[in-house]
Structure formats: C-alpha cells, structure tokens
C-alpha cells in the first residue's frame, strides 16, 4: 500500500484520473510518444490497485472496496483518454491542457492485455501486431510502428532507444498480453499461430553471433529488429565505452513464464485449479499431445 500511495502522490493527476510518466523513467527512453499519460504506468497502477484489493479482501480489510473502485476508475480513464478510435490503438497523451493524442502506435499500447484490463471491444488493436508496416519484423516486434516517419534503428546517440529497436522486455509483455487475449476472449485478429511465430522469433533472438558465425545463448539490451544484432552492445564496443558488456544477462525477460504459462498453457486460477490450454496450433509439433 505504501508503494502505491507514493506513486499516487507523485504521479497522479486527478483531473484525468490517470498517472503520468516520463518515457525514460518508464524504462523506455527516446520514444516517439514521449512523456505524458502513458498506457504502461496506468496499466501497472490499475493492476497494482486490483491486486491490493484482492489481498485486502482475503484479509477482511475494509480498504478492499475502495481499492477495487480505484482500479476500475484508472482502467476506465485509460481507455477513455488514451484510446484513439480512428487509429484503433492506445496512445500517449501529453499532460498539457487540450493536448491531442500522439500520432504514433507504440508496442507498449498492448500492455493492458498483460494484466487482463482490456475488454473485447479493443481487441482490434491486435491487427497491427503481425503487419510489417507496423510491428512485425524478423527479430521484432519493433517498439514503434515502422510506417511512422520517426521510426528508426540507429547506431548513434543514446544506446537505449525505444523508437524502433526490439526490446525483449516489451516483447515479453506483448506475448503475455497475447496469451491472455487468446485464452480469455474470442476475436478474429490474431490466433495461436501468431503466438508461436512471435514466440519463436523471441527465442531465436536470444543469441549472439561471433565473428566465425557461431551462435551463443545471450540476453542483452535491445535488438536490431531486422538483423538480430544487439544494438547497445555493438555501440559500446565500437566506442570502447566501459563497461562494454553492461547488458549481459539483462534481467528483462519472461522466457520461462511464457513457455509454462503461455506456450504450454498451464494457467493457475483463484479457484485452486489449473487450467491447461496450450497455444500450440493443431499439427504444429508431431511430438506434442
């Protein structure tokens, strides 16, 4: 509760009933959408309030209802103010008065699905995920849509850019959201083949290739979505900037959870039961039953 209260003191704007954040402090530097009311922070805080409400309920704490109400209001305001009906996507809104939504779709727009915050009315947003004009790439998905004029994959400037490169953290959150969508809602925009395609790309990305072409299992910071090169690592090495291996074993991914909870589909429930719903298309593996 103290953590939630501190965030509310510092980042909550009552006029909109939403939290705001700088993109860099959101862990997403040099983004196209930039600072403002972001889908990320509001998804995190709505989910935290909902979780605290459940814990309070189990403890017979009288704060349970207030926290549940707060979680619902954050969720409602997020879709009220950050959903662009024309673009069919959630976007960043600047904190300035009379501001318009930023003109870019960014991968973090899928964050609400990672916490089961989005209703079926918004599933249309997923039609952009596997589209090469938007997010799909050989080592993607990209963190910003590729059709935007500010999309780029740069080897200059700041090492950590969220204006195009693929980030395993963002990919992980997107895959969690996709698994939740496929398990909990009926829609026609994505299916289990899309999940396994994206998950296979994610798994294939977690390597580095040496000068002799030998692949080594590897987790680092951000990826070139078209070549699979670890961008920050290459930039630091080229600049001889210490520590050159600062990104090694970067703890930003959910690989095991995605295999167990998503791919194999072992999903716990509050009823002390396990639901099993594999996201492996029929006939995809001849050794899976």
Tell me what each language-model feature is.
Residues 32-43, 62-69, 99-103, 158-165, ...:
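Alpha-helix capping and helix-loop boundary segments enriched in small/acidic/polar residues
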């Amino acid at each position: 509760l103290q953590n939630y209260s501190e965030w509310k003191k510092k980042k909550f704007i009552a006029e909109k009933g939403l939290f705001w954040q700088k993109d860099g402090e959101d862990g997403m530097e040099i983004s196209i959408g930039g600072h403002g009311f972001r889908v990320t922070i509001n998804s995190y805080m709505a989910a935290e309030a909902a979780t605290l409400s459940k814990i309070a309920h189990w403890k017979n704490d009288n704060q349970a209802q207030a926290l549940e109400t707060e979680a619902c209001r954050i969720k409602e305001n997020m879709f009220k103010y950050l959903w662009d009906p024309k673009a069919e996507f959630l976007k960043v809104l600047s904190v300035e008065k009379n501001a318009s939504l930023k003109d870019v779709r960014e991968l973090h727009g899928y964050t609400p699905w990672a916490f089961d915050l989005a209703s079926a009315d918004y599933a249309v947003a997923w039609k952009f995920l596997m589209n090469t004009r938007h997010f799909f790439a050989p080592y993607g998905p990209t963190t910003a849509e590729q059709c935007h004029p500010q999309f780029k994959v740069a080897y200059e400037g700041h090492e950590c850019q969220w204006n195009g490169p693929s980030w395993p953290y963002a990919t992980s959150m997107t895959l969690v959201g996709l698994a939740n969508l496929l398990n909990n809602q009926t829609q026609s925009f994505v299916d289990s083949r899309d999940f396994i395609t994206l998950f296979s790309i994610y798994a294939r990305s977690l390597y580095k290739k040496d000068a002799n072409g030998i692949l080594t299992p590897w987790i680092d910071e951000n990826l070139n979505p078209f070549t699979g090169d670890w961008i920050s690592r290459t930039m630091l090495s080229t600049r001889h900037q210490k520590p050159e291996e600062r990104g090694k074993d970067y703890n930003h991914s959910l690989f095991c959870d995605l295999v167990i909870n998503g791919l194999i589909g072992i999903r716990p429930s509050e009823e002390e039961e396990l639901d099993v719903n594999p996201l492996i298309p029929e006939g995809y593996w001849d050794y899976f039953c």
